Every structure is written in structure tokens, then in C-alpha cells.
């Protein structure tokens, strides 16, 4: 029942265009499953990062056979839950893109991308499991006993132990700490491409590093389409630094500083590899808009966790449908919506004819 029910539940998450509830699913299957059976499934299942890996492992092994560069992409996001009661996983988190705190479920994911296919191989919910008194306000607040950088390293270790075949780790500046760089290069013997903030300090030579002659990277003589080798403060190995220009939505010009640990890669290769990171933005968007991540009204931590991972399972199902039907997730969702409208119109016409 459990395996069949997770398959049915993920179908429901993909098919739904409103709140996803136990009552709604029970009604959809004409009562073949009761409300209590569905709530019991959500309350007693143990969906987590380990079960996610077992679910996607056969697909990952097939994808590893494809030609091209395989990458692991790390990023976090927040599933907004403004009306849910606060607990260890539903709490206030700083949203660095919106520059303010948001109430919801913060999660960190590891996405394996190769040949245009994206598969989540690890995901963790950020738990603020410690309460403390803010000395400035005197109010009780929550914090996590483990940092996101520590969690990232833990997830990388698990992924390495699972023998996922990848070439680079990609992440934005929020995860580009020197500790993460050293861990990937020295402990895992892998390469990385990270963005850096413009005020990150670097030395132009090993001698400058030893003498403490570090300068902000935005002051370095770096042109587009070129790279220089630098020593980021805190590292004992050089990285290739490139400066990439891009156009924002408001037509203003932006700059990305990319640091790559692979000294054999040139500007074009580094920027092409980092371009793969944007698939994680599509992952987050599809989770929220196509897999009903934010549409469950559950109030209990356990059911919230299980719904979260079920939404990721639903994303994987959409990715498989994308491959089979040559349609992106939003095109698939649109087709479902149009067919639902057609069925609704047909039913309405039948009802109208009965009145004639």
C-alpha cells in the first residue's frame, strides 16, 4: 500500500492546481482511499534524503553513462508557509534574494545535472532545533545546531559514499567559504566552480599570499574573456578567477566573479560549466509551481516533512515525463490544465443539456 500510495500521492501533487489535502485526494479517487488512510500515510511514512537516493539511484546510474560533464549543484530555498504554526522546520528564515525574513520551510538540496537532465540526489530540511534569548530584544528565537556549510559538507560526503560520478561542485557565493573549497579539493579530490562576492580577498601570487598582500577581487586587473590565477584568502592552492558580465531583467549590467579549482579550464569552459547551476533555479520553481510543494495545509512536523519529500519525488516523476515526452515541466502542467478545463466544460455542457 505504501509504495502504491506514494505513487498515487505524487500523481495528485502534479495534477492538482489548488490546495492538496487528504480529503481532496480521497474525493478524487471516489473514496477508494479514505481520508484517514491518506493522513496515516503522511504521518507514518519515513521519507527522507536516504529514501530519496534509493528512489533516484537507478536513474542516476543511467544518467552517469551519458556523455558530458556531470555536476553537483547546491542551493537552498524556502517553501513559504505564512499560515502554519511555528515549529522546528516552519520558522522564520532570512531570504537573501528578498532581503527580509520569511516564514516557511528552508531546505538545502544537492542536484545532479548532466546532459540537460536534473535529478535531486540529496535534500535536507533546515531544522532550527535550538531556542535562545536574543540579548538585544529579550525575545525567544530559534537557531540551527548545524550550519548550512556543515550540512553541505555532510551531504557531499554521503553523495561521495554513494559513488555518484560527477566532475564539479557548483554553488553561489553563500556556499563559497574557504572551508567548503578545501573540503571539495583536498578531502573529496573534486573540482568546484563558485561565485565570489566582489570584496573577497585574494593574492596574485604565492609570495603575496605569504606576505599577507591580499586585495579585493574587484580591484584586480581582470577583463572579460580572460582569467588569472589567484590565491583566495584562506586557501593554500590557487584558483582560476574569471569575470563574467551579464544583463539583468531591468537591462542593467551585472558582474559575476567565478572561482574554479581546475587549472586546466579556460574562460569559456568555466562559464559554460557554471551555466549549469541555473538548473537549480528551475528545480525550485518547478517544485513550487508544478509539484505542489507549498500547497499542503498540514500542521504537524512529520507530515510536513513527508509532504516535502513527496514533492521532490513528484519533481523526479516530472523529469522522467520530460524525457519521455520532450516537454518541459511547465508544458506538461499546462497540458494537464487544458485537459482538465476540457473535461470541466464537457461536464458543464452535459449538466446544461439536462436542464433543457
Regions found by a protein language model. Give the residues of each.
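Generic hydrophobic, aliphatic-rich segments that mediate packing or membrane embedding
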Residues: 21, 55-56, 68-72, 106, ...
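Short N-terminal helix-initiation segments at or just after the protein's N-terminus
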Residues: 8-20, 50-57, 106-112, 198-203, ...
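Gly/serine-rich nucleotide phosphate-binding loop at the start of the catalytic core
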Residues: 1-51
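Hydrophobic, Leu/Ile/Phe/Ala-enriched alpha-helical segments that form helix-helix packing faces
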Residues: 29, 60-64, 156-163
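Active-site-proximal, Lys/Arg-enriched surface segment
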Residues: 12, 43-122
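Glycine/proline-rich, flexible active-site/cofactor-binding loop segments
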Residues: 20, 26, 33, 111-117, ...
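Single, function-defining residue in the core of a domain
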Residues: 2, 11, 16, 85, ...
